[in-house]
């Protein structure tokens, strides 16, 4: 058994401090074949090439 890092009295401190955000109503994702088709179009059809590399997030937050 490993040693406990810090006292167990502080367990769950951060989770209890974070404000509760309600789940949003979203349109349902396609399933099975249709979802694989969506991934294919996202990855290979609408490719965003930057410096000759494929980027998953074309507009990153870093400058």
Swiss-Prot record:
<protein>
    <recommendedName>
        <fullName>Small ribosomal subunit protein eS30</fullName>
    </recommendedName>
</protein>
<comment type="similarity">
    <text>Belongs to the eukaryotic ribosomal protein eS30 family.</text>
</comment>
<keyword id="KW-0963">Cytoplasm</keyword>
<feature type="region of interest" description="Disordered">
    <location>
        <begin position="1"/>
        <end position="33"/>
    </location>
</feature>
<dbReference type="InterPro" id="IPR006846">
    <property type="entry name" value="Ribosomal_eS30"/>
</dbReference>
<keyword id="KW-0689">Ribosomal protein</keyword>
<dbReference type="GO" id="GO:0006412">
    <property type="term" value="P:translation"/>
</dbReference>
<keyword id="KW-0687">Ribonucleoprotein</keyword>
<dbReference type="GO" id="GO:0003735">
    <property type="term" value="F:structural constituent of ribosome"/>
</dbReference>
<comment type="function">
    <text>Component of the ribosome, a large ribonucleoprotein complex responsible for the synthesis of proteins in the cell. The small ribosomal subunit (SSU) binds messenger RNAs (mRNAs) and translates the encoded message by selecting cognate aminoacyl-transfer RNA (tRNA) molecules. The large subunit (LSU) contains the ribosomal catalytic site termed the peptidyl transferase center (PTC), which catalyzes the formation of peptide bonds, thereby polymerizing the amino acids delivered by tRNAs into a polypeptide chain.</text>
</comment>
<dbReference type="Pfam" id="PF04758">
    <property type="entry name" value="Ribosomal_S30"/>
</dbReference>
<dbReference type="GO" id="GO:0022627">
    <property type="term" value="C:cytosolic small ribosomal subunit"/>
</dbReference>
<comment type="subunit">
    <text>Component of the small ribosomal subunit. Mature ribosomes consist of a small (40S) and a large (60S) subunit. The 40S subunit contains about 32 different proteins and 1 molecule of RNA (18S). The 60S subunit contains 45 different proteins and 3 molecules of RNA (25S, 5.8S and 5S).</text>
</comment>
